[in-house]
Amino acid sequence: MPQVELSAGTIDYEDTGGGGPAIVFGHGLIMDGTQWRHVIADLRTDFRCIAPTLPLGAHRQPMRADADLSMRGVAGLLGELLEHLELSEVTLAMNDWGGPQLLVGSAYDERLARLAICSCEAFDNVPPKGPAQLLPYIARMPGGIAATMLPFRFDRLRRLPLTWGWLSKRPVPKEVMDRWFAPATTQPGVRRDLRKYILSAKQGRRELVAIADALRRFERPALVAWAGDDRMMPKDHGPRLAGLLPQGHLEVVADSYTLIPEDQPATLAKHMRELMAR
């Protein structure tokens, strides 16, 4: 897997290559780019698909101790990657983690051509409603993150509503979940990074509320794909986001929880192809 040295540390990324328009995929907390594997398998024939592993708990190498791992800091790493790979006219896709929205109106804004906002944190929903809202409190306790990760070692516990059960309707394959959860269950440095991000939740909430003004000025094509049965992202946030974006187009994806790339990848890939044609 290719790697790149960014300001916070070494980041792994997948790159399908090719000369087509670039799509960069942002992933969720304690996940990596394999969250998009089905969608990428569909799109890679026509588009260059790039999926970095950001320091959100599934990264293999701990970041530098002084790294800014707030929501804005991690979003900045995504921007640094665009710059390092000399990408322009990028379609930026996101799901679960809402941080990529912070690139709109930033120093990296001119590299963006389109947005694909797919059931993710928005406005004041940080951390998202449900069990995740306990994480900032747990992270303040000594050993809290290590204790939180213990159930993720066991297959049966991963599907409980208090762990992963509300993220996808359909089970994520064991080997994919093993890949996601191994770093934070085995590496203290990765848990330190994850804790640092979680403790910045209040700051991230303020920044996602404030980004609404920048979204209003994003005069480029934008897809808002919202899961029809989402348990964690409020149903009204999809229409609100689409209404903010001057060229926003809303698609409600039926029979899906938050992880649309897991539950309805073919439908999402179809909507993304339509976005790329705009």
Annotate each language-model stretch with its function.
Residues L6-D15:
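A short loop-to-beta-strand scaffold at the N-terminal edge of the catalytic core in hydrolase folds
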Residues D15-Q61:
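Conserved HGGG/HGGXW glycine-rich cap/lid loop of the alpha/beta-hydrolase fold
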Residues L29, G57-S88, W97-L244, E251-V252, ...:
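Flexible "cap/lid" subdomain of the alpha/beta-hydrolase fold that forms the substrate-access gate
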Residues T34-H38, K129, D236, R240, ...:
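Generic recognition of short, well-ordered alpha-helical segments
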Residues R37, L102-L103, A269:
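Short, hydrophobic alpha-helix immediately C-terminal to the catalytic nucleophile
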Residues Q247-R278:
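Catalytic active-site module of serine/aspartate enzymes centered on a nucleophile-bearing elbow/loop
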